[in-house]
Curated annotation (Swiss-Prot):
Signal peptide: none annotated. InterPro entries: AAA+_ATPase (IPR003593), DNA_recomb/repair_RecA (IPR013765), DNA_recomb/repair_RecA_CS (IPR020584), P-loop_NTPase (IPR027417), RecA-like_C (IPR049261), RecA-like_N (IPR049428), RecA_ATP-bd (IPR020588), RecA_C_sf (IPR023400). GO terms for cellular component: cytosol. Its main location: cytoplasm. The keyword Transmembrane does not apply. GO terms for biological process: DNA recombination; DNA repair; SOS response. This is Protein RecA.
Length: 342
């Protein structure tokens, strides 16, 4: 349907005035190509990058990672930081739980000498630090661990047992309104780790809920639910956990996809074993009985031996990793248009 010429002129003048006053890109037509493709940062897990659809976690957005205790939430965020630092990006970790282990972080590949770290006293202080870092435009990734530990100042200064109904939820709601625009302007990825609580008196449906109210659920572009589905054993010794991550919400690609990988204690995500599994699934690695072969060369009997072989042959690992990424992520931007998933 044709638009009246006078209306077109008036609209063009209004758009020009808006862009002049608020900056280029402050308003645009939804079908335009500019600013539609979302830049991402790898999670450190190829299968999770594929499940996210865009090849990783989106920059300029809010991401929530939640799950039960000791299921790998902090490990996953540290792997994201390590992956970002390998690309020369600046990262910050807001340790509201005061529980970050720098030795463990270093084992996961985090450059602790260049990692910004804060252990705030109150929830307001933590969120103000996030806002200041994002407005600087110099920080690429910010992790907050965790929402449940963001204690409002009034609660800290009050007595134990005082009622503070909805205080944390109001604090988070106000912070989300303030942070969302700044993150978009600075292209900063903000990851919130969250814990699970049980709703009392729920007879039907899922009784689980996350802390901090509903604001984070609405403002998050991606929500990841992380669960342990089994144990990794070396003989009788448990050396890791089988982990499943479900993409519960995704504004940049199709949601509800899942990724499964191993988290090894003291080592993080087993990327070598993950490549073996993906290689077999996509017929780049041959499996005959218990033997694994790549390009006609036997690389091990059993997954553990094949994984060890990949660790000892980085050139083979890099070749297989490159092939799988080209195969699985070549359409990563297919659904990154805002008109597809809002």
């Amino acid at each position: 349907m044709a638009i009246d010429e006078n209306k077109q002129k008036a609209l063009a003048a209004a758009l020009g005035q808006i862009e002049k006053q608020f900056g280029k890109g402050s308003i645009m037509r939804l079908g335009e190509d500019r600013s539609m493709n979302v830049e991402t940062i790898s999670t450190g897990s190829l299968s999770l990058d594929v499940a996210l659809g865009a090849g990783g976690l989106p920059r300029g957005r809010i991401v929530e990672i939640y799950g039960p205790e000791s299921y790998g939430k902090t490990t996953l965020t540290l792997q994201v930081i390590a992956a970002a630092q390998r690309e020369g990006k600046i990262c910050a970790f807001i340790d509201a739980e005061h529980a970050l282990d720098p030795i463990y972080a270093q084992k996961l590949g985090v450059d602790i000498d260049n990692l910004l770290c804060s252990q705030p006293d109150t929830g307001e202080q933590a969120l103000e630090i996030c806002d200041a870092l994002s407005r600087s435009g110099a920080v690429d990734v910010i992790v907050v661990d965790s929402v449940a530990a963001l204690t409002p100042k009034a609660e800290i200064e009050g007595e134990i047992g005082d009622s503070h109904v909805g205080l944390a939820a109001r604090m988070m709601s106000q912070a989300m309104r303030k942070l969302a625009g700044n993150l978009k302007n600075s292209n900063t990825l903000l990851i919130f780790i969250n814990q699970i609580r049980m709703k009392i008196g729920v007879m039907f449906g899922n009784p689980e809920t996350t802390t901090g109210g509903n604001a984070l659920k609405f403002y998050a572009s991606v929500r990841l639910d992380i669960r342990r589905i089994g144990s990794v054993k070396n003989g009788d010794e448990v050396v890791g956990s089988e982990t499943r991550v479900k993409v519960v919400k995704n504004k940049i690609a199709a949601p509800f996809k899942q990724a499964e990988f191993q988290i090894m204690y003291g080592e993080g995500i087993n990327t070598f074993g993950e490549l073996i599994d993906l290689g077999v699934k996509h017929k780049l690695v041959e499996k005959a009985g218990a033997w694994y072969s790549y390009n006609g060369e036997k690389i091990g009997q059993g997954k553990a031996n094949a994984t060890t072989y990949l660790k000892e042959h980085p050139e083979m690992y890099n070749e297989l990793n490159t092939k799988l990424r080209e195969m699985l992520l070549n359409h990563a931007g297919e659904f990154t248009s805002a008109r597809d998933f809002c």
